[in-house]
């Protein structure tokens, strides 16, 4: 039995509130159960130095957690003067995931910066960030299209992410903190709306699992991402 009482293949409730802030071109508050992330997408009419003059755009991401997003208060990374390795890893993952479904040539010489700020953490913050980030990106791009700043849609597919793991010997979908903290194995799966794999991060803790175990987690991830894709489509009116 899972601590939450959910079935092995049952997601936490998903909520995506769009236009959560008034300034960003795209913004959402995304909730997976008690995990809540504020995501904004900001359009900048410039690109990184390595892309100047190449006629293509860029999508990048930043990630952070509010000090009391967790059970005990954590110090702000700005106060420490540097980002943790975990933060750098997650924001790179978010950026890679979004770039996998964007045609940079069609975006033109502009950059869209995604900011993911975790306001409450209960497991799956990076996957919630990716899933919410796609919606914020979609909203921002829609505004560019409406303003006739883009002639073609650069977003070629949707993307979502979910965690799966082995908890007390059973493969389960969408781990919360109580499960994630003691799971024998856990993984993050990033998939596109067409079913393609963008990234898989999987590891074991104190136990191992075989190839079939990994495939069972992937099958669960496909179930979960299917629900996320439906929530994303509803949020953006598609």
Curated annotation (Swiss-Prot):
CDD domains from the UniProt entry: RNase_PH_bact (cd11362)
Keyword Hydrolase set for record: no
InterPro entries, alphabetized: ExoRNase_PH_dom1, ExoRNase_PH_dom2, ExoRNase_PH_dom2_sf, PNPase/RNase_PH_dom_sf, Ribosomal_Su5_D2-typ_SF, RNase_PH, RNase_PH_bac-type, RNase_PH_CS
Positions contributing to phosphate binding: 86, 124-126
Catalytic reactions of this protein: tRNA(n+1) + phosphate = tRNA(n) + a ribonucleoside 5'-diphosphate
GO molecular function, one term: 3'-5'-RNA exonuclease activity
Keywords, ordered alphabetically: Nucleotidyltransferase, RNA-binding, rRNA processing, Transferase, tRNA processing, tRNA-binding
E.C. number(s) listed in UniProt: 2.7.7.56
Pfam families the UniProt entry points to: RNase_PH (PF01138), RNase_PH_C (PF03725)
GO biological process: rRNA catabolic process; rRNA processing; tRNA processing
Family: Belongs to the RNase PH family.
HAMAP family for this protein: RNase_PH
Subunit structure: Homohexameric ring arranged as a trimer of dimers.
Job of this protein: Phosphorolytic 3'-5' exoribonuclease that plays an important role in tRNA 3'-end maturation. Removes nucleotide residues following the 3'-CCA terminus of tRNAs; can also add nucleotides to the ends of RNA molecules by using nucleoside diphosphates as substrates, but this may not be physiologically important. Probably plays a role in initiation of 16S rRNA degradation (leading to ribosome degradation) during starvation.
PANTHER family per record: EXOSOME COMPLEX COMPONENT (PTHR11953), EXOSOME COMPLEX COMPONENT RRP41 (PTHR11953:SF0)
The protein, known as: Ribonuclease PH
Gene that produces this protein: rph
């Amino acid at each position: 039995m899972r601590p939450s009482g959910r079935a092995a293949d049952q997601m936490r409730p998903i909520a995506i509130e769009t236009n959560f802030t008034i300034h960003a071109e795209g913004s959402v508050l995304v909730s997976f159960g008690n995990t809540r992330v504020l995501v904004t997408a900001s359009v900048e009419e410039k690109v990184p130095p390595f892309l100047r003059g190449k006629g293509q755009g860029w999508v990048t991401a930043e990630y952070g957690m509010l000090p009391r997003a967790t059970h005990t208060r954590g110090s702000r990374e700005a106060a420490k003067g540097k980002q943790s390795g975990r933060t750098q890893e997650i924001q790179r993952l978010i950026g890679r995931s979004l770039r996998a479904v964007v045609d940079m040539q069609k975006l033109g010489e502009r950059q869209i910066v995604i900011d993911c700020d975790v306001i409450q953490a209960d497991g799956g913050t990076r996957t919630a960030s990716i899933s919410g980030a796609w919606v914020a990106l979609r909203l921002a791009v829609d505004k560019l299209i409406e303003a006739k700043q883009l002639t073609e849609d650069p977003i070629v597919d949707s993307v979502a992410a979910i965690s799966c793991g082995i908890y007390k010997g059973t493969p389960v979908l969408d781990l919360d903190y109580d499960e994630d903290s003691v799971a024998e194995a856990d993984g993050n799966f990033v998939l596109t709306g067409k079913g393609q794999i963008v990234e898989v991060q999987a590891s074991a803790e104190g136990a191992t699992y075989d190839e079939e175990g990994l495939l069972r987690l992937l099958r669960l991830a496909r179930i979960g991402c299917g629900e996320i894709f439906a929530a994303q489509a509803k949020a953006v009116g598609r």
